[in-house]
């Protein structure tokens, strides 16, 4: 009886550890980005939501390989973060199929239309 009890406790804690470790390494998706950018546009680009929105709407065109799932985006030297956030927010609202993509892929798909990279790597 005691062995069964300890086995159940072990299984329970293993399951909890799996859930916690999965959520610790989860990356934001397009829906998360939409919510963060809507909040940022409404309340200002501060806090974690502001940082998240800014990070994903200003992608760096560095370390992009030809087989990368993340589209290449070439922004101007001094990008307007608010305008980029608005463009990504509108693009996500109009394209809900991007909600389940990672935030960097979703933002890249939207921004590559306005800011394509014309030169080779």
Language-model features: locations:
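Prokaryotic Sec-type signal peptides and long signal-anchor helices
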Residues: 17-19, 119
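N-terminal signal peptide c-region/cleavage motif recognized by signal peptidases
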Residues: 21-23
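Short N-proximal segments of mature Sec-exported proteins
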Residues: 27-89, 110
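Short, compact, well-ordered microdomains
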Residues: 89-121
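Bacterial N-terminal signal peptides that target proteins for export
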Residues: 2-12
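Domain-scale selection of a single, long terminal region
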Residues: 12-16, 66
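Absolute protein N-terminus
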Residues: 1, 26-27
């Amino acid at each position: 009886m005691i062995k069964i009890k300890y086995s159940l406790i072990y299984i329970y804690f293993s399951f909890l550890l799996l859930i916690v470790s999965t959520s610790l390494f989860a990356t934001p998706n397009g829906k998360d980005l939409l919510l963060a950018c809507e909040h940022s546009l409404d309340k200002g680009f501060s806090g974690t939501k502001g940082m998240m929105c800014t990070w994903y709407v200003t992608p760096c065109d560095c370390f992009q390989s030809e087989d990368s799932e993340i589209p290449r985006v070439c922004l101007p030297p001094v990008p307007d973060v608010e305008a980029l956030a608005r463009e990504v927010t509108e693009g996500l609202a109009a394209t809900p199929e991007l909600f389940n993509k990672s935030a960097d892929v979703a933002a890249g798909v939207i921004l590559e239309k306005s800011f394509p990279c014309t030169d080779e790597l």
